[in-house]
């Protein structure tokens, strides 16, 4: 078993309801007490240009991303992560609203199809199409 002070920063002993004891070892790579990197706060102008670029294309090539990052005074990584997050947000929005205007278009012809369907199943249609044989 690795030593707790070399490879692990914290060892926690947990006692379960049935009385058994378990040891939790948290690796140094998961140092939960280290300070987090401050969150990037985008200006309104940056957000406007990022949204505009996203609406043009949800994906950017490396060179386009680098140019956009430079023009906005951001790092390439900040733009990349913003686009990843924005695509995720868009997928969430799309999944919440499954009825879109383009999915309603086929319904425009529904009335004509329904009338033909009704006409087909009338007694006259049965007789004229020899559907019912005597």
Swiss-Prot record:
GO cellular component: nucleus
Disulfide bonds: none
Places the protein is found: Nucleus
Tagged with keyword Plastid: no
Stored Gene3D superfamilies: Homeodomain-like (1.10.10.60)
Record keywords: Developmental protein, DNA-binding, Homeobox, Nucleus
Keyword Acyltransferase: no
GO molecular function: DNA-binding transcription factor activity, RNA polymerase II-specific; RNA polymerase II cis-regulatory region sequence-specific DNA binding
DNA-binding region boundaries: 35-94
GO BP term, example: brain development
Transmembrane segments: none
UniProt main location, coarse: nucleus
Protein name stated in the entry: Homeobox protein ceh-5
Gene source species: Caenorhabditis elegans
Lineage: Eukaryota, Metazoa, Ecdysozoa, Nematoda, Chromadorea
């Amino acid at each position: 078993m690795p030593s707790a002070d070399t490879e692990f920063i914290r060892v926690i002993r947990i006692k379960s309801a049935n009385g058994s004891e378990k040891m939790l070892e948290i690796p140094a790579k998961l140092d939960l007490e280290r300070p987090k990197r401050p969150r990037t706060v985008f200006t309104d102008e940056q957000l406007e240009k990022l949204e505009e670029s996203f609406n043009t294309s949800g994906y950017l090539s490396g060179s386009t991303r680098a140019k956009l990052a430079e023009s906005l005074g951001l790092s390439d990584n900040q733009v990349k992560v913003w686009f990843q997050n924005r695509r995720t947000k868009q997928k969430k929005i799309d999944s919440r609203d499954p009825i879109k205007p383009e999915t309603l278009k086929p319904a425009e012809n529904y009335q004509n199809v329904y009338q033909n369907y009704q006409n087909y199943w009338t007694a006259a249609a049965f007789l004229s199409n020899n559907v019912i044989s005597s």
